[in-house]
């Protein structure tokens, strides 16, 4: 039954003219982003959030490699990796990959055109005896990200000091490949995004005020077309994603809280929420909500062979089953 459900979803994904053509890109690229409901358009310095905002990696000051592998509901294999590295003091480059594979989908011939009951019976017996042939669905995306950090000073008038704003911008160039049964499809998409990071402690002269960030991204600029070998075209529509985050150090205990919000405008308008608690920069507790339901997760950071390692876990209970996801990130310098 699950195979039938998955195949139905695949048909929507491969042959829809609108919002399903890029659904595999929205599974998630890290346990951190998945755990907070993927409300990461305004989350800075998280390279794996590139699909929602390519500008965020400009605020990362180190090279990193991350990898996520998932057996989705015991039916599909999904992976994601990300490599990012600074190119000087203000520019960061990233290369990322995503892949979804659903294998051994049984091909069931259409026998509705056989009206004779005996002929239909014989056909079914022959098919069962010989076995059904199968095919696979593969969807991959390769993305290049380039992000640059800009700084501006703002004089609010009532302050003795000017306010320093961090304003990175970024762009994604993505190559998409699809393979379903005997069909192949390809397309190229472009995203552009930006962040504005505001230190509220400088705005209000209150030392414990947090860091407020606004983010916005236009994905699939002017639409991304998937060209199929059948000469059919699918269109991934342009979407505008906007959101905000607020990072606050708690006074009494050594905990930092991140509150995240994101909304998407386009053919599938939606809202996403997330929260992350960071305990002593070592333990991460995460929760979030999106159209798939409620998510939860944890993360741990430690040193191994003089490299900083992040291990993450996220969990989702879905109608198709429970999804457990694990990933790791290695900071290379």
Which positions does each model-derived feature cover?
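Sec-dependent N-terminal signal peptides
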Residues: 3-13
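Subset of outer-membrane beta-barrel
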Residues: 17-333
